[in-house]
């Protein structure tokens, strides 16, 4: 655990760890204090209620003391006669003791002397208040009592009894309370230690998406800068060549101009792709609309013309014979990316097949070619931004490794899946499944 703490101290998620651990510490500390406070406040509730009840009936308290007495004291007979008239029975237990005092707070009856109660001293200022005292018995053991002092107000007889003190032994309650407090502290401390590990885990989990996002952003900027560096270098080289030939005609430098224009087109395509990706990062929200079957026929006709211009054989099959509901713009962009990718990675006179079909809930796109193919290792990375299977070939074809990344985002937005397979004997197959709706279920 200490090694984890040491690593966290120097990690990027240390601030998250401190924040989480601080919250857990505050929670467990507050819970511990509240529980202990509740225990203390409720520990003597029943004892204090009993003492208050006895203080309201001093005659019954005197009767209790007399009944427990083992010897007679001065003026006790008159007090016995008067107290015997009490009909209300006091609510007492075996751990309750009564001490009688005269007006000078001299003990008249102290009960069991073994308990050491004959040595306690009370004062009039404590009258009517419940408080706690510690008494040592004959064996030197400490006993804890809750005490209330009351005035007897016995005036019908001649007696020296002026005050009575009721004591209830709470030593067992104190011992039980201490054990419970220790148990609570141990349990809370254990959970506090567990919260340390929980804070480590939460810090790692909380910061992971941020770190991944920062790494992707850093990689994105580095790759974009790298892609822009090449066309800028070409432009600089061509322009410097033009400056070195001030007497040359346009025909003489037409190759440099054409190359520069090509690089400008590449940069414009790159910046457009980057802008599209940035917009998609904010979240693609499909706008559903009815897409007629003629849309696919028109799109395939355009693809056929492009394939012919690039000396490719393009075959298509439209198995959709009804109107579907999806985002037409995103669907066309997805189809174009897959078609353009097949054209780039297929040699001249190569073959490209595009099949589209649908069920009640899903639309299926299948694009296959007999091009150079994609290795198993590359299949895991082709949807990453700026990843290219053959960088030299892709660069020559004007690609930047952004198309398939954007296609994956579109597929995810349309609640679909895309898989890549090998075509036999060579080439690649892209299979796409996206969710669609029927016109009757179109969302308004």
From Swiss-Prot:
PROSITE patterns according to UniProt? HIS_KIN
Q: Which residues carry this modification: Phosphohistidine?
A: 226
| CDD domains tied to this protein | HATPase, HisKA
The main location is membrane
Catalytic activity of the protein: ATP + protein L-histidine = ADP + protein N-phospho-L-histidine
* Highest taxon of the lineage: Bacteria
Q: Biological process (GO) annotations?
A: cellular response to phosphate starvation; establishment of competence for transformation
- Answer whether the UniProt record assigns the keyword Cytoplasm to this protein: no
Which Gene Ontology cellular-component terms appear in the entry? plasma membrane
Q: Which GO terms describe its molecular function?
A: ATP binding; phosphoprotein phosphatase activity; phosphorelay sensor kinase activity
Where would you find this protein in the cell? Cell membrane
The membrane topology of this protein is: Multi-pass membrane protein
UniProt cross-references to InterPro entries, sorted A to Z = 2-comp_sensor_kinase (IPR050351), HATPase_C_sf (IPR036890), His_kinase_dom (IPR005467), HisK_dim/P_dom (IPR003661), HisK_dim/P_sf (IPR036097), Sig_transdc_His_kin-like_C (IPR004358)
Question: Where does the Histidine kinase domain lie?
Answer: 223-438
Query: Gene3D superfamilies from the xrefs?
Result: 1.10.287.130, Histidine kinase-like ATPase, C-terminal domain
Transmembrane feature ranges = 21-41, 183-203
Its keywords, alphabetically, are: ATP-binding, Cell membrane, Competence, Kinase, Membrane, Nucleotide-binding, Phosphoprotein, Transferase, Transmembrane, Transmembrane helix, Two-component regulatory system
What EC identifiers does the entry list?
A: 2.7.13.3
Protein name, per record? Sensor protein CiaH
């Amino acid at each position: 655990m200490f090694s984890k703490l040491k690593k966290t101290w120097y990690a990027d998620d240390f601030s998250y760890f401190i924040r989480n651990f601080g919250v857990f510490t505050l929670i467990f500390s507050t819970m511990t204090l509240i529980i202990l406070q509740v225990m203390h406040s409720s520990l003597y509730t029943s004892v204090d209620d009993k003492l208050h009840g006895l203080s309201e009936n001093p005659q019954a308290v005197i009767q209790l003391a007399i009944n427990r007495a083992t010897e007679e004291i001065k003026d006790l007979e008159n007090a016995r006669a008067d107290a015997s008239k009490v009909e209300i029975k006091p609510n007492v237990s075996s751990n309750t003791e009564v001490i009688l005092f005269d007006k000078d707070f001299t003990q008249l009856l102290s009960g069991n002397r073994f308990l050491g109660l004959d040595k306690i001293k009370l004062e009039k200022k404590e009258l009517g208040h419940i408080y706690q005292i510690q008494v040592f018995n004959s064996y030197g053991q400490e006993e804890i009592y809750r005490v209330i002092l009351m005035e007897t107000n016995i005036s019908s007889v001649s007696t020296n009894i002026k005050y009575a003190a009721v004591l209830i032994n709470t030593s067992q309650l104190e011992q039980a309370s201490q054990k419970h407090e220790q148990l609570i502290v141990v349990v809370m401390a254990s959970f506090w230690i567990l919260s340390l590990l929980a804070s480590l885990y939460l810090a790692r989990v909380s910061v992971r998406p941020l770190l991944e996002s920062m790494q992707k952003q850093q990689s994105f900027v580095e790759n974009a800068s790298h892609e822009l560096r090449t066309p800028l270098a070409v432009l600089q080289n061509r322009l410097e060549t033009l400056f070195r030939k001030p007497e040359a005609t346009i025909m003489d430098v037409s190759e440099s101009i054409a190359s520069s224009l090509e690089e400008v087109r590449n940069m414009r395509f790159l910046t457009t792709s980057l802008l599209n990706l940035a917009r998609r990062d904010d979240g693609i929200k499909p706008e559903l609309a009815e897409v007629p079957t003629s849309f696919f026929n028109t799109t395939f006709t355009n693809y056929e013309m492009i394939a012919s211009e690039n000396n490719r054989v393009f075959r298509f099959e439209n198995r959709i014979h009804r109107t579907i509901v999806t985002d037409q713009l995103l669907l066309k962009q997805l189809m174009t990316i897959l078609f353009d990718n097949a054209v780039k990675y297929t040699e001249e006179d190569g073959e490209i097949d595009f099949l589209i079909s649908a069920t009640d809930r899903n639309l299926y796109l299948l694009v296959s070619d007999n091009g150079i193919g994609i290795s198993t290792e590359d299949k895991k990375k082709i949807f990453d931004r700026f990843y290219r299977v053959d960088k030299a070939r892709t660069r020559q074809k004007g690609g930047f490794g952004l198309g398939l990344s954007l296609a994956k985002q579109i597929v995810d937005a349309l609640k679909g899946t895309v898989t890549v397979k090998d075509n036999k004997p060579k080439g690649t197959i892209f299979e796409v499944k996206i969710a669609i709706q029927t016109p009757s279920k179109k969302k308004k």
